[in-house]
Amino acid sequence: RKIHPSPKPPQLMRDIIKFFTKENEHILDYFMGVGGTLLGASLSNRNALGIDLSSKFISAYKKANKELKLKEQTTIKGDCLDVLKNKKLIEEYLNNKKFSLIAIDPPYGDMMNREKTGEAIKKNQSTDATPFTKNKKDLGNMNWSEFRENFIETIKYSMPYLKDRGHYVVFIKDLQPKEGKTNLLHSDLIEEINKIEGLNYIGMKIWVDESINLYPYGYPHSFVSNQLHQYIMFFRKKLKK
């Protein structure tokens, strides 16, 4: 699973899944990557559907899942928007049910396409960009404006498959601020997602990625913050009247 630039620990996803769902319910992750959400679902006796553009990532999930001797969840290789628009395909999987939780860790625009700085330099590692894929449909290859527009579309197309009072969980990480730009991506996304009819922002948690080390970036000439954390944002689908 280390082939992915930003894998999520299955234990973290298991805890989130157990909090928001019951056993045997269904979870969707349409940016599944190397399958942290799917592994978390198997660890908590839930069912999950994962979608990803990369066959390499899906294979890595299946290999890890086999080594852990867990139930293999359903995966679909393809562009998430194309798959979500395929109502027949999703409804065949759900078999007259709905997802109780949609948990996603989207590629943050073209963040991973940028040359590495900071920790990579300190460790004498490659500073080359590490995009998720080279596919033009990959949200990780879009600028922030394009990403935001397409990402909001994915939520709108996935909403019909989520049960009333079901939850969305969205991971996001901010960029370092630049002159004239705060780059508070989590705040930007909260405002945009909260505009979607039928969906309400209900709060967040902050997850610290302990695999990232602290370094005195900029010292002693300037202040550059360490960004070890990601925001886990929670939204709830309204009950239809």
Model-derived regions, located:
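Class I S-adenosyl-L-methionine-dependent methyltransferase catalytic core
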Residues: 1-241
